[in-house]
Regions:
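Feature targets compositionally biased, intrinsically disordered low-complexity regions
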Residues: 7-8, 40, 103, 190, ...
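Acidic/histidine-enriched segments that form metal/cofactor-coordinating
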Residues: 87-88, 94-207, 236, 250-253
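His/Glu-rich zincin catalytic helix
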Residues: 21-96, 118-121, 127-134, 205-256
Length: 256
């Protein structure tokens, strides 16, 4: 009995001593993060992951539904659509052909405080992805045809996802309108048809100029690439894009 007691005590002591040692072991789930800021203000975040020969890219702009003008509800989301309509150098459809044609995927989404554009593809596609993202950061194909087309697309999206979902769906639209008093938080980010139809090319050009500069963006790269190599690529494609003034942020984010 005494032998068992001593043995049990010894095992307990070993277990207790092992706790600090285990705590000192590196966390195998720690994700390596490297950051760098270009001279034009673009923030670059890179995480090397050699588990597969792929890469994920996310370009995030610090503008979302909260910053759209009061008479232009839904404009941030509409503008996200226009970012896929091509540029003078890379016409509409180029993004899809280059990325999806090489086995990758792409998408975009609009949130209250940011809008992001993502691509996942073989690592060999990283240079084309960065070139395309830099190209549409510089300018877009500002045309009445593209604007009218995407106004109709967004209105159809509203019909399908909001108006024809009487028993559920996008509850966050109703919650925001009921929970908050300030317009920035309680308006419908999808927008009204009247506001969407009222958007002009001048609105589009101004929004791109004010919010889609490198100093208002973060680009994240995760995948089969060394941080130094990724930083060099971003510098190559984005470094010459000049920083642009951004409108002052509203003084308060209070929702009271």
């Amino acid at each position: 009995m005494r032998c068992r007691t001593v043995l049990g005590g010894a095992l307990a002591l070993l277990a207790w001593l092992a706790i600090p040692a285990a705590a000192q072991q590196p966390d195998r789930w720690t994700i390596p993060i490297h950051t760098h800021t270009l001279d034009n203000g673009l923030t670059v975040v890179v995480s090397e992951d050699r588990s597969s020969p792929t890469v994920g890219v996310s370009v995030v702009y610090h503008v979302g539904m909260r910053l759209e003008p009061e008479n232009r509800t839904g404009f941030a989301h509409l503008f996200e659509h226009l970012m896929f309509q091509g540029t003078p150098v890379a016409p509409k459809g180029t993004f899809d052909r280059v990325i999806q044609g090489g086995g990758g995927i792409l998408n975009g989404s609009t949130r209250p405080d940011y809008t992001n554009y993502i691509e996942t593809a073989p690592v060999s596609a990283l240079r084309p992805i960065l070139w395309l993202e830099a190209d549409r950061m510089k300018t877009l194909d500002f045309s009445e045809t593209n604007l009218k087309n995407q106004q109709d697309v967004v209105k159809e999206e509203i019909r399908n996802n909001v108006q024809n979902q009487p028993y559920g769906g996008f509850m966050w639209i109703d919650i925001g309108m009921q929970a908050f008093q300030k317009w920035e938080n309680n308006h419908d980010g999808y927008g009204s048809f009247k506001d969407l139809e009222g958007a002009t090319l001048a609105d589009v050009e101004g929004f791109h100029r004010d919010y889609y500069g490198p100093n208002n963006a973060v680009i994240g790269i995760v995948g089969d690439i060394a941080p130094a190599e990724a930083f060099a690529m971003v510098e190559e494609y984005f470094g010459a894009i000049p920083a642009r003034p951004t409108p002052p942020r509203r003084s308060s984010r209070s929702t009271a």
